[in-house]
Swiss-Prot record:
The lineage of its organism: Bacteria, Pseudomonadati, Aquificota, Aquificia, Aquificales. Keywords: Amino-acid biosynthesis, Hydrolase, Serine biosynthesis. CDD domains: HP_PGM_like. Its EC number is 3.1.3.3. The active site is at H9 (tele-phosphohistidine intermediate), H150. Belongs to the histidine phosphatase superfamily. Metal-independent phosphoserine phosphatase family. InterPro entries: His_Pase_superF_clade-1, His_PPase_superfam, PGM_Phosphatase. It comes from Hydrogenobacter thermophilus (strain DSM 6534 / IAM 12695 / TK-6). Catalyzes the dephosphorylation of L-phosphoserine to serine and inorganic phosphate. Is poorly or not active toward D-phosphoserine, DL-phosphothreonine, 3-phosphoglycerate, para-nitrophenylphosphate, and fructose-6-phosphate. Does not display phosphoglycerate mutase activity. The keyword Disulfide bond does not apply. It catalyses: O-phospho-L-serine + H2O = L-serine + phosphate; O-phospho-D-serine + H2O = D-serine + phosphate. This is Phosphoserine phosphatase 1. The gene is pspA.
């Protein structure tokens, strides 16, 4: 069995205003830095063998807090990077709703059919994270693996782990500095904890529903 701990990065400077980040690279907010420390404190109780992170700053800095508490290195992994939002990158949700109303509707209602103009499709994200998870299963059997990623690849990972269609993409909560625990067993994957945020206390902020 692999014990998989999926982590969403702590709050970035753009999260509170509802700005699509994609492959752009804002820093953690001051609240996000506090969230990352609280998350690291929470996970310090676990035995951890390896930590993977998306190479973007908001994920890597979150992963570093976890790694330093356990004296581990962080392995940067391109396959778990955020979706390329293309033309939406850097735009506020309200701006996207006004400029691309039909595309926004499709993203909220039919995400499995979306390919961002100048960017990436959800199917592409699914394929890359599924390949990564298959490699984790083979390489880290009988280990505990932390994966620090973003909302879109994490929701795609949940779909891959449970064998459900990408149309169910929005069915999984994914707040900043949350973590989930999944047992990757021989015949099935079992979600034991999903979107845990109780360690954040007063620094918890509910994620925007359309990002």
């Amino acid at each position: 069995m692999v014990k998989l701990i999926l982590v969403r990065h702590a709050e970035s400077e753009w999260n509170p205003v509802g700005r699509y980040q994609g492959l752009l690279d804002p820093d953690l907010s001051e609240r996000g830095k506090k969230q990352a420390k609280l998350l690291a404190q929470e996970l310090s109780r676990e035995h951890l063998d390896v930590i993977y992170s998306s190479p973007l700053k908001r994920t890597y800095l979150t992963a570093l807090e976890i790694a330093e508490a356990k004296n581990l290195e962080v392995i940067k992994e391109d396959r778990i990077i955020e979706i390329d939002h293309g033309m939406w990158s850097g735009m506020l949700v309200e701006e996207v709703m006004e400029k691309y109303p039909e595309d926004f509707r499709r993203w909220v209602e039919e995400p499995h059919k979306v390919e961002f103009q100048g960017g990436e499709s959800l199917a592409s994200v699914y394929n890359r994270v599924k390949g990564f998870l298959e490699e984790v299963r083979k390489r880290h059997w009988n280990q505990t693996v932390v994966v620090v990623s973003h909302t879109v690849p994490m929701r795609a990972m949940y779909c891959a782990l449970l064998g459900v269609d990408l149309s169910k993409f929005w069915s999984f909560g994914c707040d900043n500095a949350s973590y989930s625990v999944i047992h990757m067993e021989e015949r099935r994957n079992v979600i034991l904890k999903l979107n845990i945020t109780c360690h954040l206390g007063e620094f918890y902020v509910e994620a925007h529903k359309a990002i």
